[in-house]
Amino acid sequence: MASKGPSASSSPENSSAGGPSGSSNGAGESGGQDSTFECNICLDTAKDAVISLCGHLFCWPCLHQWLETRPNRQVCPVCKAGISRDKVIPLYGRGSTGQQDPREKTPPRPQGQRPEPENRGGFQGFGFGDGGFQMSFGIGAFPFGIFATAFNINDGRPPPAVPGTPQYVDEQFLSRLFLFVALVIMFWLLIA
């Protein structure tokens, strides 16, 4: 209820004669600005208002410019959620007569539509790098990522280095060093 919405003066209860709030420029309103929406980009009255799926309101010209200047990373200017031309909904309201057609200045805002929900059946992408299911087993402070590491589940690491390269030599040295450290720790635990 903190967002600005249509004025309460347009409701049937407040439009009765005899009350000062019955007029559109009543004392309770700040210059008639309560009947408008504010764009989250230009912070002005929203022209050709659209709302994103994450719930933020913008002018269509402002949002169109935002999307055009960032074609590779289209995110909501407020919360950084994914946003695109297809993921905004136009807002229509009473008293919007006399507006200029937005197609003359920028491409038209998208039509209102209800997209079908995505069907993600089961464990789609399990272990194939799709960002699907990831598991890890553990007891107390000792995590056992045996299955996750052995089967390369959801692992985004690059392939191992080619034998004979300096990177391969460094990796082998570190591997032997950590093996030696692990053996020393295990030996210390046995004699302690």
Swiss-Prot record:
| Annotated segments matching region Required for ubiquitin ligase activity and protection against ER stress-induced cell death | 29-80
Which locations, inside or outside the cell, does it occupy? Answer: Mitochondrion outer membrane; Endoplasmic reticulum membrane
Q: InterPro entries of this UniProt entry?
A: RNF5/RNF185-like (IPR045103), Znf_C3HC4_RING-type (IPR018957), Znf_RING (IPR001841), Znf_RING/FYVE/PHD (IPR013083), Znf_RING_CS (IPR017907)
> Which parts of the sequence lie on the Mitochondrial intermembrane side of the lipid bilayer?
152-171
Q: Matching PROSITE patterns, A to Z?
A: ZF_RING_1 (PS00518), ZF_RING_2 (PS50089)
Q: How does it assemble?
A: Interacts with ATG5 and BNIP1.
Task: Give the function comment from the record.
Answer: E3 ubiquitin-protein ligase that regulates selective mitochondrial autophagy by mediating 'Lys-63'-linked polyubiquitination of BNIP1. Acts in the endoplasmic reticulum (ER)-associated degradation (ERAD) pathway, which targets misfolded proteins that accumulate in the endoplasmic reticulum (ER) for ubiquitination and subsequent proteasome-mediated degradation. Protects cells from ER stress-induced apoptosis. Responsible for the cotranslational ubiquitination and degradation of CFTR in the ERAD pathway.
Xref: CDD domains: RING-HC_RNF185 (cd16744)
Alphabetically, the GO molecular function entries are: protein-containing complex binding; ubiquitin binding; ubiquitin protein ligase activity; ubiquitin-like protein conjugating enzyme binding; zinc ion binding
Q: Using the UniProt record, give the first listed, main subcellular location.
A: mitochondrion
Q: What class of enzyme is it?
A: transferase
Q: Under what name is this protein listed?
A: E3 ubiquitin-protein ligase RNF185
Its membrane topology, per UniProt? Multi-pass membrane protein
Listed Low complexity bias regions = 1-27
Domain notes from UniProt: The RING-type zinc finger domain is responsible for E3 ubiquitin ligase activity.
Q: Where are the zinc fingers (RING-type)?
A: 39-80
Q: Where is this region: Disordered?
A: 1-30, 90-123
What organism, scientifically named, is this protein from? Pongo abelii
**One Pfam family per UniProt:** zf-C3HC4
According to its UniProt entry, one GO biological process term is:
autophagy
Q: Which GO terms describe its cellular component?
A: endoplasmic reticulum; endoplasmic reticulum membrane; mitochondrial outer membrane
The EC number(s) this enzyme carries: 2.3.2.27
Q: In which pathway does it act?
A: Protein modification; protein ubiquitination
Q: Which reaction does it catalyse?
A: S-ubiquitinyl-[E2 ubiquitin-conjugating enzyme]-L-cysteine + [acceptor protein]-L-lysine = [E2 ubiquitin-conjugating enzyme]-L-cysteine + N(6)-ubiquitinyl-[acceptor protein]-L-lysine
Arranged from A to Z, the UniProt key words for this protein are:
Autophagy, Endoplasmic reticulum, Immunity, Innate immunity, Membrane, Metal-binding, Mitochondrion, Mitochondrion outer membrane, Transferase, Transmembrane, Transmembrane helix, Ubl conjugation pathway, Zinc, Zinc-finger
